[in-house]
């Protein structure tokens, strides 16, 4: 489940710690002395266009969601149990070994190696070419390996984790050339992988590969055969094509490094290496097999085909982050069959075959990034993440094409859904619809008919309803006669009304037939308010008169005189 990195021969390998790895992964471009072509950089004016395209603003949220998903996957992978533990608990079958000297290296959930078989032969074979400061595959003790990976994993940025494979950053440790600037190890340079066939590597000495003894060749080819037949190689890494190009440049055969994918609990996913720019990276998390001078391994055995042992489809890849999408383009077509590689195990890739097959292992650069937006094989469901930079470039180039493509995609998904709808026969087979014959349908109709007839026969007839006076019989002649009778009755009542003289004679009406009319002037009909017209002098005179009247003329009892109220003068 870890990241796969392969080491080639280097004059002075130096280990890169986690801090350097973080700076390498975050670097935007290649150094000055690198042989990689320059990256496709977007101009400064392309970012200004985003201001006028509000429908693209929502794309910034994808990276946050992707980072959270990566953290969750990292936590889950760190707690995953090893293969030995699962075999011990009986959840996995142990694969039988074909040869006695086969060395199969599995990795557990943390990216560490679990060595099964004879580890001494593996270390001996790897240790032989280490003469004159040349290392093919630096392989220390497991404790040193674990400590090194822990330090690397703690400082590895989360940007380079794109899926379950890339979300365990402690899975790879690199060694670089003694040159000053470091090349980017992640797949941020998307165009580098596609031009891998043109790249020539001239920094490794050509004589280092010839130091491998014939014993090393035979043991390694037999171990290759055993490992390929036992575990089933799922991918041939792009670094092998680099080694082939190196052989063509130097004219001498060199060691081809085949990285075997880790065997994990199903559902299994294909091995997902991040293509390194530097050919001298060291794989500490995947088993390494060195193949050298011997029979040739044909390219036809390495063509893409599904693995019979796995349940996943062969074309199923995992989404990479925006920095690792370029690397996935080389690895999308690198799945091999278990049977084909099991038969062709002891053979080798000759320089001519490797040179001819460079084009077959590099995917075209103009492939849409949507092809690599696939489901993750973990049980948490898909990580829906696409490369925002590539999408923005595509949208800037052809907005109409993307709209048309999305419309076609919508129609395709609708057609797929309609095509997946089960037929009537399938529903009957699944016992969702009851299977009925023509006779059964006829019987059902007859039952419904008899039930309706029985209900209708229980309804009362019109005669019964008329007898109960519920339904009245309607006749036009009778209706006309009823109307005429009503008119006659009303006219009779009106004819019996007394006349006005009769009412006057009975003194019921008392009024004069003639009315006298007189003219009168208009006047104010409002109430009269004399106090509103009194002057203050008038009011003072009234108060004085009242006081005199109360004091002299009004009869008041002597004991109650003190209670007599006088007005103010």
UniProtKB/Swiss-Prot annotation:
Keywords: Actin-binding, Phosphoprotein, Protein phosphatase inhibitor, Repeat
Acidic residues bias: start-end ranges: 386-399
Feature: compositional bias, Basic and acidic residues: 140-151, 423-444, 461-483
Intervals holding RPEL repeats: 71-96, 412-437, 450-475, 488-513
Compositional bias segments (type: Polar residues): 1-13, 212-224
Tissues in which the protein is found: Expressed in the brain with high levels in the cerebellum, specifically in the Purkinje cell layer, choroid plexus and thalamus (ventral, rhomboid and anterior nuclei). Moderate to high expression in the hippocampus, piriform cortex, olfactory bulb, entorhinal cortex, as well as in geniculate bodies, lamboid septal zone, preoptic area and ventral pallidum (at protein level).
UniProt-annotated stretches for the region Disordered: 1-47, 98-253, 295-483
Entry keyword tRNA processing: no
UniProt keyword annotation of Aminoacyl-tRNA synthetase present: no
Subunit structure as annotated in this protein's UniProt entry: Binds PPP1CA and actin.
PANTHER family per the UniProt record, alphabetical: PHOSPHATASE AND ACTIN REGULATOR 2, PHOSPHATASE AND ACTIN REGULATOR PHACTR
Protein name as annotated: Phosphatase and actin regulator 2
Gene name of the record: Phactr2
């Amino acid at each position: 489940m870890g990241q796969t990195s392969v080491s080639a021969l280097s004059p002075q390998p130096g280990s890169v710690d986690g801090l350097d790895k973080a700076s390498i992964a975050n670097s935007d471009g290649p150094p000055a002395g690198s042989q990689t072509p320059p990256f496709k950089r977007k101009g400064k004016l392309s970012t200004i266009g985003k201001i006028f395209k509000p429908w693209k603003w929502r794309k910034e949220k994808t990276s946050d969601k992707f980072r959270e998903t990566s953290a969750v996957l990292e936590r889950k992978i760190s707690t995953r149990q090893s293969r030995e533990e699962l075999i011990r608990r009986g959840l996995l079958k142990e694969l039988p070994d074909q040869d006695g000297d086969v060395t199969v290296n599995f990795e557990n959930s943390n990216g560490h190696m679990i060595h099964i078989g004879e580890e001494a032969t593996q270390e001996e074979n790897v240790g032989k070419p280490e003469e004159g400061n040349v290392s093919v595959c630096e392989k220390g003790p497991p404790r040193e390996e674990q400590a090194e990976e822990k330090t690397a994993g703690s400082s590895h940025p989360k940007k380079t984790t794109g899926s379950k494979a890339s979300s365990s950053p402690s899975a790879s440790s690199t060694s670089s050339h003694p040159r000053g600037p470091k090349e980017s190890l992640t797949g941020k340079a998307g165009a580098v992988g596609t031009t891998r066939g043109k790249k020539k590597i001239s920094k490794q000495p050509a004589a280092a590969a010839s130091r491998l003894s014939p014993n090393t060749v035979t043991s390694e080819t037999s171990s290759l055969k055993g490992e390929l037949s036992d575990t089933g190689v799922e991918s041939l890494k792009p670094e092998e094509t680099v080694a082939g190009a190196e052989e063509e440049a130097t004219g001498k055969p060199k060691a081809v490094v085949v990285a075997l994918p880790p065997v994990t609990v199903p559902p299994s996913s294909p091995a997902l290496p991040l293509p390194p720019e530097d050919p001298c990276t060291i794989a500490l998390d995947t088993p390494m097999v060195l193949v050298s001078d011997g029979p040739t391994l044909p390219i036809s055995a390495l063509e893409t085909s599904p693995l019979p042992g796995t349940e996943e489809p062969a074309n199923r890849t995992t989404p990479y982050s925006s920095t690792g999408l370029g690397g996935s383009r080389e690895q999308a077509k690198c799945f091999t069959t278990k049977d084909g590689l099991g038969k062709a195990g002891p053979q080798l890739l000759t320089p001519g075959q490797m040179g001819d097959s460079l084009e077959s292992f590099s995917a075209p650069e103009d492939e849409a990034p949507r092809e690599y937006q696939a489901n993750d094989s973990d049980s948490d469901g898909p990580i829906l993440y696409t490369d925002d930079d590539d999408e923005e470039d595509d949208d800037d180039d052809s907005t109409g094409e993307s709209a048309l493509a999305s419309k076609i995609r919508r129609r395709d998904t609708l057609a797929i859904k309609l095509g997946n709808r089960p037929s009537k026969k399938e529903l009957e087979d699944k016992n969702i619809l009851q299977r009925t014959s023509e006779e059964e349908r006829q019987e059902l109709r007859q039952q419904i008919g008899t039930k309706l007839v029985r209900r209708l026969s229980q309804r009362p007839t019109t005669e019964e309803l008329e007898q109960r006076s519920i339904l009245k019989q309607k006749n036009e002649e009778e209706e006309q006669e009823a109307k005429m009778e009503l008119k006659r009755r009303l006219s009779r009542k009106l004819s019996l009304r007394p006349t006005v003289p009769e009412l006057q004679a009975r003194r019921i009406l008392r009024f004069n037939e003639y009315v006298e009319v007189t003219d009168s002037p208009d006047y104010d009909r409002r109430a009269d308010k004399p106090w509103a017209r009194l002057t203050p002098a008038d009011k003072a005179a009234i108060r004085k008169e009242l006081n005199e009247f109360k004091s002299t003329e009004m009869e008041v009892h002597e004991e109650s005189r003190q209670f007599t109220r006088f007005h103010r003068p």
